[in-house]
Amino acid sequence: MAEGGFWKKLTNFFTASEEDEDIIEEDYMDEGYEAEEGTGFVPVQTRAVPVGSTIWVYQPSSFSFDVDSSFIGARIKDGYIIILNLQDLDDLSAQRLIDFVSGALYSVEGKLKAISSSVFLLVPKNVRVESFNEGFGTE
């Protein structure tokens, strides 16, 4: 096997040949075709959470999916930390709200942390949550 042949093949593999330069690529559209506005994904820009940021505490006493989901969804989208207290909601309403919140957090790569059976911490992806339970409340 000739050494020059190997290097020539390797070089030709990574570079355009003379035959490739003769090819002219044209963009074309069919008659009557109209470009549509894209509904694709838009990357979410993460922001560092500044010291002294607002933490929202939300405790609904009744459940209205339109109102509650809009309120919480907007704050999740904006990157706020939220403490969600569902102790005043019935089990079905609380589950519906948690399902919505889980989906909203998933879409922004956020996290849901259960503090108790009815209190939850909702954080954006750039916030680390650490737990320390041992010895709390004892001296």
Curated annotation (Swiss-Prot):
<comment type="similarity">
    <text>Belongs to the SepF family.</text>
</comment>
<comment type="function">
    <text>Cell division protein that is part of the divisome complex and is recruited early to the Z-ring. Probably stimulates Z-ring formation, perhaps through the cross-linking of FtsZ protofilaments. Its function overlaps with FtsA.</text>
</comment>
<dbReference type="InterPro" id="IPR007561">
    <property type="entry name" value="Cell_div_SepF/SepF-rel"/>
</dbReference>
<dbReference type="GO" id="GO:0043093">
    <property type="term" value="P:FtsZ-dependent cytokinesis"/>
</dbReference>
<dbReference type="InterPro" id="IPR023052">
    <property type="entry name" value="Cell_div_SepF"/>
</dbReference>
<dbReference type="GO" id="GO:0000917">
    <property type="term" value="P:division septum assembly"/>
</dbReference>
<keyword id="KW-0717">Septation</keyword>
<dbReference type="InterPro" id="IPR038594">
    <property type="entry name" value="SepF-like_sf"/>
</dbReference>
<keyword id="KW-0963">Cytoplasm</keyword>
<dbReference type="GO" id="GO:0005737">
    <property type="term" value="C:cytoplasm"/>
</dbReference>
<dbReference type="Pfam" id="PF04472">
    <property type="entry name" value="SepF"/>
</dbReference>
<protein>
    <recommendedName>
        <fullName>Cell division protein SepF</fullName>
    </recommendedName>
</protein>
<comment type="subunit">
    <text>Homodimer. Interacts with FtsZ.</text>
</comment>
<keyword id="KW-0131">Cell cycle</keyword>
<keyword id="KW-0132">Cell division</keyword>
